[in-house]
């Protein structure tokens, strides 16, 4: 029976995991099993935080719009409702940017609803 040297594929898979674990501390960057666990944990955390970032920015935009709209004597929910009724299709990110950078422009949006 001929000798079988263990696989190119397995070595590549392990090296790929260890490359992803570069920068981790101790055994988490040097040994395959702890590195694999840490890489999986890091991927879960990065996915979770990408989703959380979307929620956080939406919260920030709503807070900024609410503060700017209350200066004009209106509530946030009434402002958004009137935007939809008047068919002005500006998303919250754009409205928040206008509110922060161009108060006169934001005032004109509020008055034109």
Swiss-Prot record:
Physiological role: Binds directly to 23S ribosomal RNA and is necessary for the in vitro assembly process of the 50S ribosomal subunit. It is not involved in the protein synthesizing functions of that subunit.
GO cellular component: chloroplast; ribonucleoprotein complex; ribosome
Gene Ontology molecular function: rRNA binding; structural constituent of ribosome
Record flagged with keyword Transmembrane: no
Cellular localisation: Plastid, Chloroplast
HAMAP family, per database record: Ribosomal_bL20
UniProt keywords, alphabetically: Chloroplast, Plastid, Ribonucleoprotein, Ribosomal protein, RNA-binding, rRNA-binding
A single BP term in Gene Ontology: ribosomal large subunit assembly
The keyword Electron transport is annotated on this UniProt entry: no
Main location: plastid
UniProt-listed PANTHER family: 39S RIBOSOMAL PROTEIN L20
InterPro entries: Ribosomal_bL20, RIBOSOMAL_L20_CS, Ribosomal_protein_bL20_C
Family stated for the protein in its record: Belongs to the bacterial ribosomal protein bL20 family.
Stated name of the protein: Large ribosomal subunit protein bL20c
Domain of life: Eukaryota
């Amino acid at each position: 029976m001929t000798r079988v040297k263990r696989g190119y594929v397995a070595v590549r898979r392990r090296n790929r995991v260890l490359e992803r674990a570069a920068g981790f501390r101790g055994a988490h960057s040097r040994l395959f099993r702890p590195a694999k666990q840490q890489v999986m944990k890091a991927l879960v955390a990065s996915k979770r935080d990408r989703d959380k970032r979307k929620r956080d920015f939406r919260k920030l935009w709503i807070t900024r719009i609410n503060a700017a709209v209350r200066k004009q004597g209106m509530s946030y929910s009434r402002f958004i409702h009137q935007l939809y009724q008047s068919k002005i299709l500006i998303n919250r990110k754009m409205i928040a940017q206008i509110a922060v950078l161009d108060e006169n422009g934001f005032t004109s949006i509020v008055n034109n609803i």
